[in-house]
């Protein structure tokens, strides 16, 4: 990867080393999104020197897929405490032994089976690689997300230079707030804190919830302006000013089949139009 990061926007130059890590996934609508949009939707940030990675696990075996399905069936039911205890126990070994990964161009390939229950393990492996490669910031997101590039980079540049940065879309989860896994920003101090306390990571929770528990009482979520776009009609109702001021967009439609690709393409057009309009 690049040894020196130089980002230029509005005549500004920064030497921050930034990585964007996208939690890869298989099946639909993700295959359609990857085929139609990736990695092209990140090409502008890549041109500015930001490194883009897709984090992949291994294809689950038949038995592993049965366990994945069983876990997810419990997770969203009244029996979720059983799921939490079961996955926490079965994945406990990864608190002391994060699996290795290999890097093939833009892909960080982790030696763990794919699945929501192992997403935290997969991302911890990717975070360790990013930390070892001396990145200043890591932004974790999803295949159905995009960012407003110039606002994104300016936001990072203006952050405090000291202390833990744990940023994202704040999610109020009772007494346990956390940053949404589709929009999470961490600096080196945050990554270091995670690895120093990884033995407390609860793999019974999804990765973003587990991360929130790690930072609980230590660092509050630094809000990153975000919009969750669910339909084409919603895009048409959003003002150009709001689009220009928003950093992160989660484009996850409610329709069946999902039309995330159409939404992302239209949103990219609106972003381009807002950049070209100096009156906004």
What spans do the regions from the language model cover?
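Conserved, well-structured core segments
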Residues: 20-22, 52, 69, 183-185
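Conserved catalytic core of nucleotide-sugar-dependent glycosyltransferases
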Residues: 116, 120, 137-141, 145-218, ...
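Active-site-proximal specificity loops/subdomain of glycosyltransferases
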Residues: 55-134
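C-terminal catalytic/acceptor-binding lobe
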Residues: 201-280
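Loop/turn elements at helix/coil->beta-strand transitions in domains of secreted/extracellular proteins
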Residues: 16-17, 47-50, 135-136, 161-165, ...
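Short, acidic, metal-binding catalytic loop of nucleotide-sugar glycosyltransferases
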Residues: 36-49
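Short beta-alpha junction loops
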Residues: 26-27, 56-61, 172
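N-proximal low-complexity "stem/linker" segments adjacent to membrane-targeting elements
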Residues: 1-29
């Amino acid at each position: 990867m690049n040894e020196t990061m130089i980002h230029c926007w509005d005549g500004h130059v920064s030497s921050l080393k930034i990585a964007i890590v996208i939690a890869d996934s298989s099946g639909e609508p993700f295959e359609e999104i990857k085929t139609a949009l990736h990695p092209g939707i990140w090409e502008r940030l890549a041109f500015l020197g930001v490194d883009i990675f897709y984090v992949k696990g291994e294809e689950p075996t038949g038995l592993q897929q049965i366990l994945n399905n069983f876990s997810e069936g419990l997770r969203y039911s009244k029996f979720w405490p059983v799921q939490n205890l079961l996955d926490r126990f079965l994945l406990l070994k990864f608190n002391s032994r994060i699996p290795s990964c290999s890097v093939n161009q833009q892909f960080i390939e982790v030696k763990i089976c794919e699945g929501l229950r192992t997403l935290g393990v997969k991302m911890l492996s990717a975070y360790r690689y990013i930390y070892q490669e001396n990145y200043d910031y890591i932004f974790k997101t999803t295949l159905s997300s995009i960012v407003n590039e110039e606002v994104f980079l300016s936001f990072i540049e203006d952050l405090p230079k000291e202390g833990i940065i744990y940023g994202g879309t704040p999610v109020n989860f009772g007494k346990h707030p956390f940053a949404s896994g589709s929009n999470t920003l961490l600096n080196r101090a945050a990554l270091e804190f995670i690895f120093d306390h990884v033995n407390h990571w609860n793999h019974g929770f999804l990765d973003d919830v587990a991360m929130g528990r790690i930072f609980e009482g230590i660092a509050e979520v630094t809000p990153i302006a975000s919009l969750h776009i669910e339909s084409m009609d919603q895009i048409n109702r959003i003002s150009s000013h709001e689009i220009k001021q928003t950093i992160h967009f989660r484009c996850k439609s409610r329709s069946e089949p999902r039309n995330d690709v159409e939404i992302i393409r239209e949103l990219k057009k609106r972003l381009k139009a807002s950049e070209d309009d100096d009156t906004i």
